[in-house]
């Protein structure tokens, strides 16, 4: 039974990167949701569902620290964005994230990773996790940029 008297904290993280590439090139990389060589400290990723893309796809990401995060795709808009929820593996009660892309007037692609999350951890732990998540997004997006622009 859940204790509804526990203090909860909600927060968000948002980071973006500009990539010199076509919409098609960036989407091709982002839409391969188990090919995550650009994801910071990712060890391996595999499908847990028969479905391999689109809403209802489930993946399991294993990290170098031994943690595993199960994610379910809940939105899929080709060449625009996808959203997912984390079911297990994070110190959170809820986590929803979207990775989106948009062509800018300069012809570059702006990739944005943003999330909303809720925790019942102590405020200090929650704030530390929020900072960690922002750094994780920044590093991963820089890896994505380097990966795309050098290939």
Identify the residue ranges that each predicted region occupies.
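Hydrophobic-ligand binding "helix-grip"
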Residues: 37, 63-108, 116-118
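C-terminal and inter-domain tail/linker signature
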Residues: 23, 59, 69-70, 111-112, ...
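A conserved amphipathic terminal alpha-helix motif
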Residues: 110, 116-151
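Hydrophobic ligand-binding cavity/cleft-lining segments
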Residues: 1-51
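Short Pro/Gly-enriched beta-strand edge/turn motifs at strand-loop
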Residues: 41-43, 52-55, 79-85
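Hydrophobic residues positioned within well-ordered beta-strands of beta-sheet architectures
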Residues: 13-15, 57-59, 71, 97, ...
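Hydrophobic pocket/interface hotspot
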Residues: 25-30, 36, 59, 73, ...
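Short, P/G- and charge-enriched loop/turn segments at secondary-structure junctions
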Residues: 1-5, 57-60, 86-87, 99
